[in-house]
């Protein structure tokens, strides 16, 4: 057996949903993670500081007794977002970031931004006060191929925005392409990127080869193998601009296994086992802690966690359920398509 001790990790991009789903999935995160940036794309979305405060209370009420977990709240950017409310939420310590969803880009994004100019007053205020903007980096215009959405977003939205507001701190969330990795590496100032567990493991073949596999469908969609390999190199590099954001996104199985299935992969329960496998495979276990526990806090201006967790490599594969049951219905767990031998033994 082999033990690996790392500081307790954080998740810098997490969907907890609400109600019965929230109560069903929260323990899979709070068991191992200290903090998480909580996505605001509920129905209705978390638009105001009051919305965020109320949602935070619902999350805290759902955390199992004995778990120590802090939800880091975000606001859903709209073309009518009030800069004063955003600043007040930030100054109070409640709001840690604002999320830009291009309208129609992903689950519950219909209230998102269609014209970036209409959101400039709040973006300018965020640049002034140092509040990060988290972006879903895809365009949604019909003429752009779905596999090119990220590259086109960088060229037509992100780069012009950064030139217009160079002091705005931007997290390019769930980077999925070599284009995204290279852009972050080449533009050091006020730019970082989160990487999901599943994009380090699957490429688009996982979705399409041998039949449609809806439980590997997510947005941004998995890309070619060359992009997956670029993501791996970024994750294991130790570069402080790259960190874990699982984008773990639960949907009940009937909404995934249908003619128009939802986008999202549920990875919270086995993310650390998957990541230990990936980093060991790349000969980079010594840099797992940076990716999961150090780089994210540094970017968001928070201290690294003092507590530690222990990952133990064992001969027998770790057993995870194929699905979890929630009050909302069954949720299929991400299958990495290889056995997992790293287990969290102390958290």
Swiss-Prot record:
Positions bound to substrate: 15-17, 41, 136, 219, 251, 263
Binding sites annotated in the UniProt record for Zn(2+) 1: 13, 15, 99, 247
Annotated signal sequence range: none
EC number: 3.5.2.3
Cofactor(s) essential for the protein: Zn(2+)
Subunit relationships: Homodimer.
Name of the protein described by the UniProt record: Dihydroorotase
Organism: Rhizobium meliloti (strain 1021) (Ensifer meliloti)
Taxonomic classification: Bacteria, Pseudomonadati, Pseudomonadota, Alphaproteobacteria, Hyphomicrobiales
């Amino acid at each position: 057996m082999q033990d690996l001790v790392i500081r307790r990790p954080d998740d810098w991009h997490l969907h907890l949903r609400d109600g019965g789903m929230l109560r069903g999935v929260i323990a899979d995160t709070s068991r191992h993670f200290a903090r998480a940036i909580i996505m605001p794309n509920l129905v209705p979305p978390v638009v105001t500081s009051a919305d965020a405060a109320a949602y935070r209370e619902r999350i805290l009420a759902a955390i199992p007794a004995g778990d120590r977990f802090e939800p880091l709240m975000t606001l859903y950017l709209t073309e009518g977002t009030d800069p004063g409310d955003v600043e007040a939420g930030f100054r109070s310590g409640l709001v840690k970031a604002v999320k830009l969803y291009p309208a129609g880009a992903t689950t519950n994004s219909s209230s998102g931004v269609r014209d970036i100019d209409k959101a400039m007053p709040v973006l300018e205020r965020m640049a002034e006060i140092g509040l990060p903007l988290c972006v879903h980096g895809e365009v949604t215009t019909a003429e752009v191929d779905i596999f090119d959405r990220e590259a086109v977003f960088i060229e037509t939205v992100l780069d012009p925005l950064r030139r217009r507001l160079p002091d705005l701190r931007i997290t390019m969330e769930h980077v999925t392409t070599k284009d995204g990795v290279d852009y972050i590496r080449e533009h050091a100032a006020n730019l970082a990127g989160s990487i999901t567990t599943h994009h380090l493991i699957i490429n688009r073949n996982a979705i399409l080869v041998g039949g449609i596999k809806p439980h590997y469908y997510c947005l941004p969609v998995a890309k070619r193998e060359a992009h997956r390999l670029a993501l791996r190199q970024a994750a294991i590099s130790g570069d402080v601009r790259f960190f874990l954001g699982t984008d773990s996104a639960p949907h009940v199985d009937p909404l995934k296994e249908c003619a128009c299935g939802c986008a999202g992969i549920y990875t919270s329960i086995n993310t650390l086992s998957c990541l230990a496998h990936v980093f060991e495979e790349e000969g980079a276990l010594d840099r797992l802690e940076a990716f999961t526990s150090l780089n994210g806090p540094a970017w968001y201006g928070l201290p690294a966690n003092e507590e530690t967790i222990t990952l133990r490599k064992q001969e027998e594969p770790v057993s995870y359920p194929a699905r979890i049951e929630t009050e909302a219905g069954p949720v299929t767990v991400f299958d990495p398509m290889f056995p997992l031998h790293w287990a969290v033994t102390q958290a």
